[in-house]
Amino acid sequence: MQAPFTNTCDPECSRQRLLLVLVVALTLQSCRDESLVAIDADAERRLREASDSIREPASVPLLNQTESKYQGTPFTADSPGLNQPPTVNPTAEELDYQARLKQKLDADRVIREVTSTSPPPADAERFNLSKSFQYAIRKSIEYRVAEETYLLIALDLLIQQHIWSPRIFDTITPQVQGVTVDSAQSTALQLVNELSARQKLPYGGEISASILAQASNELQEAVITGQTNSIDVALNLNIPLLRGAGLVAQEDLIQSKRNMVYGARAFEDFRRRFYIAVFSDYHDLVVQQQVIANTRAQVERLRSIVEREDALVESGRQVAFQADLAKQRALFVINNLATLEEIYKLAVDRFKLRIGYETDKAIVIEPEMLDLDAPTIDPGQSIASAFEWRLDLQTARDRVVDSRRKVDNARNAVLAGADFFATASLLSNPDFFNGVQLDDTFNNWAVGMAVDLPIDRTIEEVNVRKAQVLLEQVDRQFVFAQNTAAVEVRQAARRIDRALYTLALQDKNIDIARNRQASIDAAPDRASPRDRTEAVDELNRAENEKARALREVQIAVLEYLRQTGQLRVSDDGEIIAPPGLQVRYRRGAGLLEQPAGIPPA
């Protein structure tokens, strides 16, 4: 039973109501920015849950590192370069090239500059292995991109989870209409508000409720002559029974949740690769430092040979060309030293780019190298470990499951459409601003079934075939990934053996070169300048190759651990060693002479 409707609202009251509705709408819009904080907190929780699910709690991006410096505006500003961005590309005639004046270089001055050493700037920041990785985690562009890629996957999951949560919508439509009533033209001011709530059902379908409220004022010569208000409440239910029924309805949500796990694996796999890349670059710098130090020692040895030969020439005991041979070799080595120092400076700048350090600031690379013992390798067990533990292979395996599910979903789309629906309306005709009485008798309702016969399902059947072909592709890609992993594990094992073999050979070469040098020093008159310079060169070459072999052994061990899925890295730049692996370092000057087993600082 509906109460009689009476309207007591004057024109000023109607305008106040309209203003109130608009103020509420603007207030809701102003709260949007605050919701971004909640989104970040929710995304961080999803990231932590995903990283915990793969037992890598340290593998969580820092959201404060991924905050955008540009917050955006609701409307894009117009500018002259909006449609055609400007390009700066002067012609050859507009360029100015300043040629350097030709002048004779002072060779002695160049030699002094090349062979002299200068201390690093006092404000230069010092880096060791762990500090390099810690800094790279915070500042590296490469690491930041990987974090943001992981974060984007979490944001996609938030979207899907929100779609599957209760959703409320409210649309307010104020409008002015020209209407004709009994051949008389009049103007109507109308305010329509539609408030609805929707909820997806877990196995397909949706339930929703909506309230549609309308208020109209008929205006004639700027005077309200009548008012009409109405409200309608509707309930709707739709449930698919064949096509679209079952877990196929949740496909996007299921895939987003699985993608979150894939993202966690991919980010952790990137961290391990990035760790090796940073350590490899760092060890390269340490090796180059050692090579430069060895070359400087070579220059000093050659300098003493040149001085001796010059003295012999002056005393008449040696012909001049023999002394010139020694001088020529010394000049070649000095030139090589200049090249090595330039290569080192470039490598340092590239290392700064790798870890995100400012390239115009000086840094000091501390002489430090890992000293891991080579593992005992069982080829079959190593490959089996890689198949079981490698994160990328686990993702490739799970993508086969995804492809099979897509075939099932494509099969579901071929079925007939059979949807059960039910609707109910609760009508009323009150002034909803002053009170609402609804008709709760549910006399307006409908229940039925919508059937879509599968007459033309050619496109859907083609999609089934496409899904089957894609499944075969993904399955073959998984097999190929396994075979590739087996090859990589074998190659990593051989790399360790080859590096150890090279290291042992260079130890022998150093002993031989030193014995040769000692023999020459014991009987200097029996050796020619060429013999002396060759002995110096061979000792330098052996020491350089040993430094490279030391680096190669450590990187090969790290790569083997990664290829077999055994590498674990903490956020402080340290290896989380499994039982049986002791993490040690070589530190300070004279890395080649240090025995193995220096404990971490």
Where are these regions (language model features)?
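C-terminal motif of bacterial Sec signal peptides marking the signal peptidase cleavage site
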Residues: 27-30
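Acidic, low-complexity, intrinsically disordered peripheral segments
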Residues: 32-81, 349, 358-380, 428-432, ...
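Regulatory alphaC helix of protein kinase catalytic domains
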Residues: 71-135, 139
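Small/polar, glycine/serine/threonine/aspartate-rich low-complexity segments that form flexible
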Residues: 74, 84, 115-125, 172-236, ...
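Amphipathic alpha-helical coiled-coil scaffold segments and their short linker/junction regions
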Residues: 136, 198, 318-327, 331, ...
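Sec/SRP-type N-terminal targeting helices
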Residues: 144-152, 202-227, 242-271, 296-297, ...
